[in-house]
């Protein structure tokens, strides 16, 4: 289809008007729908599924913008491109939100029961899924909604069951009592990477544990006195001579008056503290291992909500931290308290609720990680490894996998994938299967659900129809090409996707993983509610437009680095788009109704035309190459420099000469170059700014229905002319140098000057002589001399450029008497400023009373004013010599 619409671009760029209706039109036309069975080479990206918990933040906007840039570029390059959308059920996060909402109505999930609570959560999901889609639309993401997935969809649930049952049958999923991270607020287990460690100023409590025979006591130290009721031994090092005679004897545990043994174990560090350690197997992972070695009982002393239970004796019912104080007070009352020392130590907190995590003995389900990690690491030694961008993150990933622990996958929640395990009501037999057991009424299903990350780990292939390996999408689009994600979830998600994909598909889940950093504020601080520095991307879009936000996010950082966000940067992008808008309007108003098939570059002879086409092709080359390497910051700078400097500031100004002249052939050639260059530039810019480029492209002479499915520009070697580039670069340098000299002596362009140019060699002499019309047009000289034997006057203003020296006699630039008078007036101003600031600095009262920063600021002003005064004096003296 070849067309050129009537010009329909208002004088002012209004993002809301430009963006209105375009996304809906793109969807109606199915431009983003992947073909799936095409002969085209496939390219796929699955969106990292956002949680259905609320608004998307700037991090999501950044993440998805990068993905959209990649997929739009690939679509234009002729790939069968799939950008697959979807959302995550986000077990603990979503359940917490729904419970908080119910709490406002004084209802708990237990009041509703499991089934009704899950129904309520599905309602929440539907509401927030719509909201998330609206945000995707606002951002302009080219998603294939016909393939949208949700982690609790039937198909994905089948994949989850398949994986669980297979791993269980291989002995890689097991159930057992172990110390896990327990969130007493959410009342669920957490995996290690759902625990945030914070340095807390706590205390070391030194206490006496009396020997049962009354012969003395052992000194123990603890940061968690509330666990004392769960102590079942005191351990010493087997080679610690201080305690050799006590090994095998017993302690009378204070307050509870329970006899516990003194055991020898190499876990104890002799040099740390007293060398005697209380052992609480049900509330500490290291103590759990000691307990196993010595067959010690495991006494759980807390309820799941963090209050003490009846094993804690008199402390039953107290909150754990209240119990801590009560126990210490009782030790003091019994004369068994030695001392309390301040102690900075790392304390685990729940990532979701912020509660202090309790090491807790619990019956949970685990994935045996060592064999799975080994397979994933082996992949990285092959050609088919996952390529980390930047490469340094591969080491981060490998170190994590080398030191991985078994993964606790069960969660004490109602919202999520229920564990496919059933227990026989009479025999206690365990059945694990993809389908329910026969005689279901005789079985009870496990109450727990799976960790959210269990289903997310299958995302790249479960969304493609796996376990049906004959599914067309699975065969065509898997493995995916690129994963874009933040470095903060390499452990949570990236590592798990890799090992699950290797285990179940035998392939990597994605060829590349592009890792970005975090969005920070302009001062480099992490955005958070407590600092009040968070930014809603939709508010930014409403004010500046999606294109401004997208370009700012995409070009504001290099791979792996954090992004400092500021509204000034968005405003700067908005100004850039305004520049593009105004330049486009100028081009369109001067095309004289040109059609696409009337664009003719066969008569290009002008150096400026050859130069802009050369620069255009250099830009195509750079943008394509940098884009392949995900260097979008550099892509942005390349496009900015070409559009703002080369096209707008230089070529359009030069184009006005033939456009406003009488030569019709020159006019038509210039129109062709303008239309061709702007059309090509819009296609290069489109992945970054989809809305405004579609608007401009539709008004330009173009081929096709939409810029979204237009062809990606390719380098045309025949349009590249190195001589024209050298010539134009020389001319631009000369013109800039003359403009700078004019600015320095305050001479307007309207005043003619005498211009003398001394070229470096014959090549530059020829360039300058052949293109003297450009110098005459943009420098306004009454006379130009280009020669090797120029002898400049002593007062000539000079400049050196790469191919020549430039001289402008000063007397030809300005009216000397008027300029001296103006400078003397300026000198008077600086004399007053110097006197004022020195008056302050010579005032002892000011120096002694004013804050240091204020005094320092005044000293800086003094330095600045003295420099300006000296500069003006020097110029006056120079002019007087003339």
UniProtKB/Swiss-Prot annotation:
Belongs to which family?
Belongs to the class-I aminoacyl-tRNA synthetase family. ValS type 1 subfamily.
Where is this protein localized, as stated in its record? Answer: Cytoplasm
* Free-text function comment from the UniProt entry: Catalyzes the attachment of valine to tRNA(Val). As ValRS can inadvertently accommodate and process structurally similar amino acids such as threonine, to avoid such errors, it has a 'posttransfer' editing activity that hydrolyzes mischarged Thr-tRNA(Val) in a tRNA-dependent manner.
Record key words, sorted: Aminoacyl-tRNA synthetase, ATP-binding, Coiled coil, Cytoplasm, Ligase, Nucleotide-binding, Protein biosynthesis
Q: Which GO terms describe its biological process?
A: valyl-tRNA aminoacylation
Native species of this protein?
A: Listeria innocua serovar 6a (strain ATCC BAA-680 / CLIP 11262)
Q: Which GO terms describe its cellular component?
A: cytosol
What name appears for this protein in its UniProt entry? Answer: Valine--tRNA ligase
Aminoacyl-tRNA synthetase in keyword set: yes
Complexes and interactors: Monomer.
Keyword Amino-acid biosynthesis appears in the UniProt entry: no
Against Pfam families, the record matches this protein to: Anticodon_1 (PF08264), tRNA-synt_1 (PF00133), Val_tRNA-synt_C (PF10458)
Taxonomic lineage is:
Bacteria, Bacillati, Bacillota, Bacilli, Bacillales
Residue ranges of the motif 'KMSKS' region? 526-530
Q: What is its EC number?
A: 6.1.1.9
Q: Which residues bind ATP?
A: 529
Record-linked SUPFAM superfamilies: Anticodon-binding domain of a subclass of class I aminoacyl-tRNA synthetases (SSF47323), Nucleotidylyl transferase (SSF52374), tRNA-binding arm (SSF46589), ValRS/IleRS/LeuRS editing domain (SSF50677)
Main subcellular location: cytoplasm
């Amino acid at each position: 289809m070849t067309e050129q619409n009537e010009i329909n671009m208002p004088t002012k760029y209004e993002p809301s008007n430009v963006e209105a209706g375009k996304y809906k039109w793109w969807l109606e036309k199915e431009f983003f729908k992947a073909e799936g069975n095409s002969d085209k080479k496939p390219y796929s990206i699955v969106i990292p599924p956002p949680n259905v918990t609320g608004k998307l933040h700037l991090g999501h906007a950044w993440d998805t913008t990068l993905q959209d840039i990649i997929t739009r570029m690939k679509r234009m390059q002729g790939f069968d491109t799939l950008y697959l959308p979807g959302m995550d059920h986000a077990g603990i996060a979503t359940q917490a939100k729904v419970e908080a909402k119910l709490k406002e109505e004084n209802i708990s999930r237990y009041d509703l029961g499991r089934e009704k609570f899950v129904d309520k959560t599905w309602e929440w999901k539907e509401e927030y899924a719509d909201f998330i889609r609206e945000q995707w639309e606002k951002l302009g993401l080219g998603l294939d909604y016909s393939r949208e997935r949700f982690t609790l969809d039937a198909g994905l649930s089948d994949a989850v069951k398949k994986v669980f049952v297979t791993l269980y049958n291989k002995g890689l999923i097991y159930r057992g009592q172990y110390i896990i991270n327990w969130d007493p607020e959410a009342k669920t287990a957490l995996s290690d990477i759902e625990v945030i460690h914070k340095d807390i100023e706590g205390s070391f409590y030194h206490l006496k544990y009396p020997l049962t025979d009354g012969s003395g006591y052992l000194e123990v130290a603890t940061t968690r006195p509330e666990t004392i009721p769960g102590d079942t031994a005191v351990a010493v090092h087997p080679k610690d001579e201080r305690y050799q005679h006590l090994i095998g004897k017993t302690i009378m545990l204070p307050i509870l008056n329970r006899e516990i043994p003194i055991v020898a174990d190499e876990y104890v560090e002799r040099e740390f503290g007293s060398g005697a350690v209380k052992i609480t197997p049900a509330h500490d992972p290291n103590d759990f291992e000691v307990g196993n070695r010595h067959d010690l009982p495991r006494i759980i002393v807390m309820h799941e909500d963090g209050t003490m239970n009846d094993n804690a004796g008199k402390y039953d019912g107290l909150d754990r931290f209240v119990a801590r104080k009560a126990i210490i007070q009782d030790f003091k009352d019994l004369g068994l308290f030695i001392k309390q020392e301040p102690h900075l130590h790392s304390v685990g907190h729940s990532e979701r609720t912020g509660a202090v995590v309790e090491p807790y003995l619990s019956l949970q389900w685990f994935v045996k990680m060592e064999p799975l990690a080994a397979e994933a690491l082996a992949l990285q030694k092959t050609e088919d490894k996952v390529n980390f961008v930047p490469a340094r993150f591969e080491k981060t990933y490998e170190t994590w996998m080398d030191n991985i622990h078994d993964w606790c996958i069960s969660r004490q929640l109602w919202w999520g994938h229920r564990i496919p395990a059933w227990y026989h009501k009479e025999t206690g037999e365990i059945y694990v299967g993809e389908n329910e057991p026969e005689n279901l009424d005789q079985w009870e299903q496990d109450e727990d659900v799976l960790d959210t990350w269990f289903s997310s780990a299958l995302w790249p292939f479960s969304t493609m129809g796996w376990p049906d390996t004959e599914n067309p999408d699975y065969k065509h689009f898997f493995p995916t090409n690129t994963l874009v994600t933040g470095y903060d979830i390499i452990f949570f998600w990236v590592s798990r996707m890799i090992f699950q994909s290797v285990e179940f598909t035998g392939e990597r889940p994605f060829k590349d993983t592009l890792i970005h950093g975090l969005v920070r504020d302009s001062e480099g601080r992490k955005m958070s509610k407590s600092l009040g520095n968070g930014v809603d991307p939709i508010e930014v879009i409403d004010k500046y437009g999606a294109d401004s936000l997208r370009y700012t996010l995409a070009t504001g950082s290099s791979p792996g680095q954090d992004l400092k966000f500021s509204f000034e940067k968005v405003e700067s992008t908005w100004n850039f788009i305004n520049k593009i808008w105004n330049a486009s309007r100028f081009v369109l108003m001067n095309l004289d109704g040109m059609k696409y098939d009337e664009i003719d570059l066969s008569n290009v002879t002008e150096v400026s035309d050859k130069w802009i086409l050369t620069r255009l092709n250099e830009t195509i080359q750079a943008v394509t190459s940098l884009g392949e390497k995900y260097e979008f910051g550099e892509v942005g700078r390349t496009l900015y420099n070409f559009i703002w400097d080369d096209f707008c500031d230089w070529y359009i100004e030069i184009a006005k000469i033939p456009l406003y002249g009488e030569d019709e052939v020159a006019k038509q050639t210039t129109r062709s170059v303008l239309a061709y260059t702007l059309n090509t530039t819009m296609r290069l810019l489109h992945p970054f700014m989809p809305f405004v480029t579609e608007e401009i492209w539709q008004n330009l002479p173009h081929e096709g229905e939409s810029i979204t499915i237009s062809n990606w520009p390719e380098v045309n070697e025949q349009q590249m002319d190195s001589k024209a580039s050298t010539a134009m670069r020389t001319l631009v340098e000369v013109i800039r140098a003359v403009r700078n000299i004019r600015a320095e002596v305050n001479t307007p362009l309207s005043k003619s000057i005498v211009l003398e140019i001394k070229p470096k060699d014959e090549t530059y002499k020829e360039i300058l002589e052949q293109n003297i019309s450009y110098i005459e047009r943009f420098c306004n000289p009454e006379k130009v001399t280009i020669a090797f034997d120029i002898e400049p006057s002593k007062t000539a203003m000079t400049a050196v450029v790469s191919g020549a020296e430039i001289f402008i006699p000063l007397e030809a630039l300005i009216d000397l008497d008027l300029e001296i008078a103006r400078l003397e007036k300026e000198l008077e101003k600086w004399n007053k400023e110097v006197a004022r600031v020195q008056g302050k600095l010579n005032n002892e009262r000011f120096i002694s009373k004013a804050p240091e920063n204020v005094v320092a600021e005044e000293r800086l002003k003094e330095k600045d004013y003295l420099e300006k005064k000296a500069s003006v004096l020097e110029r006056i003296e120079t002019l007087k010599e003339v």
